Structures are given as C-alpha cells and as structure tokens.
Curated annotation (Swiss-Prot):
GO cellular component term of the entry, any: ribonucleoprotein complex
Pfam families in alphabetical order: Ribosomal_S21
Source organism of the structure: Bordetella avium (strain 197N)
Protein name: Small ribosomal subunit protein bS21
Family designation: Belongs to the bacterial ribosomal protein bS21 family.
Keyword entries, A-Z: Ribonucleoprotein, Ribosomal protein
Amino acid sequence: MPIVRLKENEPFEAALRRFKRTIEKTGLLTELRSREFYEKPTAERKRKHAAAVKRHYKRIRSQQLPPRMY
C-alpha cells in the first residue's frame, strides 16, 4: 500500500495529488478493477488475445503512409 506523508505546511490537495500519482504508478486501481469480478481463465485469454490483435493493427495503421490527396 503506497504511503504519502503530509509535509509541513503542505496543502491537503497537494498531498492528495501525490497520493493519486503514486497509486497510478503502482497500478493498484487497475488491479482492483480486474479482481472485482471473477473472470474465467478462457475469458481472460480471449480478452488478452483480442487486445493484442487490436494493438497489432493499431501499430500497423500508424506505420502506414497516409493516402495521397490529389
């Protein structure tokens, strides 16, 4: 669990921003969301494979030259 200590004369909002940043870096929220409901191993593999295919096509699309405009 990430710990953020409040510095002297530091506003609470700044400490909250630091806490949110540390939570985001550790990936705690994404882990919690993924563990919120049970996902069958086959469903997890299927979801990960679909994401990999989507990333692959996105990478190919970004590497292609744009069509010529006449």
